[in-house]
Amino acid sequence: IELLPILIQTARGLFVAHSHGVIHRDVKPANIMVSDTGEVKITDFGVSYSTGQGQITQDGMVVGTAQYISPEQAQGQQATPQSDIYSLGVVAYEGLAGHRPFTGTTPVDIAAAHVNNPVPPLPDSVDVQLREFVMSMLAKDPLDRPKDALVVSRTLARIERRLLDQ
């Protein structure tokens, strides 16, 4: 299964959710289902947050999976569309490198690494444009990440087309 089409479709799906005020908060491979025809479905919106509803989690409450959690979520801050972009960046990193960017003995150690540790570079074997873009998705500051998930899907689609044309 090719990684880029999965990432592109997942980003599109997240953009649709975000444009309806829904933030997933737990983007990870287990929540990205791929059909036999290659169609992607994002599952488990059980911990999602709707910007239109009252706050259902207390300030400081951490929601998400440690291996894929954004730095701001790990610090108990409100998740935003950029939080989902970060988590999708972790999925992309794992697909390209063969391992997650951060490990630790406990979920707290892993979440702390997302906050405090620089993201290890992706292998040189990964296309330089793709490498740089995935690293931008993993920026510690949400404002340094791509503007929205549509930008993510379009940029990845452009990179995919260029790689296919080579």
Model-predicted regions and their roles:
Residues I1-D165:
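Eukaryotic protein kinase
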